[in-house]
Amino acid sequence: MLKNKRNKRTWLIILLAVYLLILLRITVFRSNSYPIEMSVNLSLFTDLAATYRENGIWMVLYLVVGNIAWFVPFGFLLPMIWQKLKSFYIIPLGFLLSLVIESGQLALNKGMFEIDDLVLNTAGCAVGYLIYKIYRDFRS
C-alpha cells in the first residue's frame, strides 16, 4: 500500500513538472512572430473591455476561460502531492506562479505584464483547489 501511494505521488510530481514546463513554454519561452511592446497594465479589466469593444464577447470569453483554465491544474495538483500543505498556501502559490510568469514575459519581452492575468490565473488556481476539495470529500 505504501509503495503504491509513493508511486502515485511520483507520477503526480512528474505530471506537475510537465504541466509547469508546458505552461512556461507557452507563456514565457514562446517565440514571437511579431514584436511585442514591453508594457505594464495595472488597470483591472480595461484590456478585456477594449477586447470586447474590438472583438466581441467570444474573444473575451476565450481570454478569461483560458487564463483561468491554465491554472486549474496547479490548484489541483499541489494538494494532491503535498496533502499536508496548508490550504491557505495554495492560492498565494498560484498568485506567485502567475507573478513569476507575468514578470518573465515582461523581462524577456514575450508579453505584457497584466493585472487581469494575475487575477484570472489566481482564480484558476482557486478553482483547481475547489475541485481538489470536492474530489477529496467525494473519495472520503
Task: List PLM regions with ranges.
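Bulky hydrophobic segments
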Residues: M1-K110, I115, Y129-S140
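Extended hydrophobic secondary-structure segments
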Residues: F113-A123
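Specific aromatic-rich, kink-prone transmembrane helix
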Residues: T122, A126, L130
